[in-house]
Amino acid sequence: MYEEMDSLIEKASILIEALPYIQKLYGKTVVIKYGGNAMINEKLKNWVMEDITLLKYIGVNPIVVHGGGPDINSVLKKLNVESQFVNGLRVTDMQTMEVAQMVLVGKTNKELVSMLNQKGGKAIGICGIDGNLIQARKHYEYVNGEKIDLGYVGEVVSINAKVLEMLAKDEYIPVVAPIGVGEDGTSYNINADTVAAEIAKAIKAEKLMFMTDVEGLKYDKNSKKIISAISADEVLKMIEEGKIDGGMIPKVLGCIDALKHGVNRTHILDGRIPHCILLEIFTDKGIGTMIHL
């Protein structure tokens, strides 16, 4: 009996620990970039959907921006189309664009919306074409000074924040696929990390969170010690020193850009940890790395 009571008291203590964080975030917006292994592993996916649904029920407004690289790769492989990347960006010809739009908007997005709704959330799936949410233009990449045409790869020109504000007002959880639209109606495939940061900036989110497949940032890649908090200047120095590279660069640069445009806190989370969102937001220790100005 005493063991059972101790267990109940421990659960109550955890809830009380979360109280000040709940009070601080009540009515605020949190943008979550959902990607990595947490999108592939069904258990992790289930936990993430539970976290997001709980956020909504306690008065936080979550906005989910998702990738879909593995799903796109799978379909392209079946079509015998080889994937090519330049500086981490997918080269997107017409056929690849059609596949990306079909997969991101028609498959990945709807699966996430369905899961959230099954958990009791009130989710709605949208992409940048809907309501001109993500207005975009063609993006060129530069390699050793050479201008590279990536096809239908876009960059964000502006975000129509009113669309997201309207959905939040009606208690919806927006789930955003990173497809943007140009002035002439052309669809563009856009890096989901960039889209998440731009949305966070446009709506002045309280938090921007990137789910990744790493524990967090480290001063030494071989070290087990994770940096719990780091300034934007230190992050830029680590990029110069080669301590941050690859797919982590657009994430941390997105964090810094968001911070400079009114977002209060940005986080790099290990999406492989069960309930990583709740652990970061509602516990004293948190997990992953917080980036601040």
UniProtKB/Swiss-Prot annotation:
CDD domains: AAK_NAGK-C. It catalyses: N-acetyl-L-glutamate + ATP = N-acetyl-L-glutamyl 5-phosphate + ADP. One of its GO terms (biological process) is L-arginine biosynthetic process. Substrate binds at residues 68-69, 90, 189. The keyword Kinase applies. It is an enzyme of class 2 (transferase). Pathway: Amino-acid biosynthesis; L-arginine biosynthesis; N(2)-acetyl-L-ornithine from L-glutamate: step 2/4. The record marks 33, 251 as: Transition state stabilizer. Keywords: Amino-acid biosynthesis, Arginine biosynthesis, ATP-binding, Cytoplasm, Kinase, Nucleotide-binding, Transferase. It is found in: Cytoplasm. Transmembrane segments: none annotated. The keyword Transferase applies. GO terms for cellular component: cytoplasm. Its EC number is 2.7.2.8. Disulfide bonds: none annotated. One of its GO terms (molecular function) is acetylglutamate kinase activity. It comes from the Bacteria. It holds the Pfam family AA_kinase. Catalyzes the ATP-dependent phosphorylation of N-acetyl-L-glutamate. NCBIfam families: argB. PANTHER family: N-ACETYLGLUTAMATE SYNTHASE (PTHR23342), N-ACETYLGLUTAMATE SYNTHASE, MITOCHONDRIAL (PTHR23342:SF0). Belongs to the acetylglutamate kinase family. ArgB subfamily. This is Acetylglutamate kinase. It comes from Caldicellulosiruptor bescii (strain ATCC BAA-1888 / DSM 6725 / KCTC 15123 / Z-1320). The gene is argB.
